[in-house]
Amino acid sequence: DGSLIVAIMNRLLDTKIRLITGYKGTSDQLLALERGEIDGSAMAYSTVLTLRPNLHQAKEISVLLQIGRAKHSDLPNVPLLSELVKSEEDRAAVAVIFDKYEMGRPFFAPTGVPAERVALLRAAFDASMKDPELIAEAKKQKLEMNPLGGAHVQALIDRLYSSPEKTVQRARQLLGTEK
């Protein structure tokens, strides 16, 4: 996803970021950043907080841009990509591409599950996200928890699937996957 973010920034913001690939994961990228092998990286802020919280706390890194519809509470002064994009058409295409970040890693059930069972599963999930033991374990592991309810995730999916064809085509152009 980092290379995708960089490619879209280069296309929409006229940045000239040179992408360096070959790092096996975010830990290797962060190590390369600390060693001065690379000048930056595009990765989840929560990953930095989990793997190298000292980098942000010691102000050894600066977060330049956020992806998504809402700013992280730790980063109120860091702009969203959508705030920097000039046209409404491109903002809509960026939303189609990056709304998945708001969902995180959703849980799904197969098509055809009765509505009352879906409601039960959603209620159980919501309750589990409030479990003090789970929250304590997440904090212990320095994991950020920002659960979204099933209705919210469903609304995001519905919005994506109702995107106008023109917006989807522009998103494909930005991704380099035009038909």
Question: What does each model-identified segment do?
Answer:
Residues 1-83:
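Ligand-binding pocket segment of bilobal, Venus flytrap-like solute-binding proteins
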Residues 3-4, 102, 132:
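A generic alpha-helix surface/boundary motif
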Residues 14-15, 38, 106-108, 143:
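A broad detector of the eukaryotic-type serine/threonine protein kinase catalytic domain
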Residues 18, 70, 110, 142-145:
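Generic anion/oxyanion-binding catalytic loop in active/binding sites
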Residues 20-24, 45-49, 68-71, 90-94, ...:
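Short, surface-exposed, polar/charged, turn-prone segments marking secondary-structure boundaries
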Residues 41, 98-103, 159-167:
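Charged, low-complexity, helix-prone segments enriched in Lys/Glu/Asp/Gln
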Residues 51-129, 178-179:
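C-terminal lobe and pocket-closing loops
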Residues 60, 84-86, 113-179:
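An extracytoplasmic/periplasmic, membrane-proximal ligand-sensing/linker region
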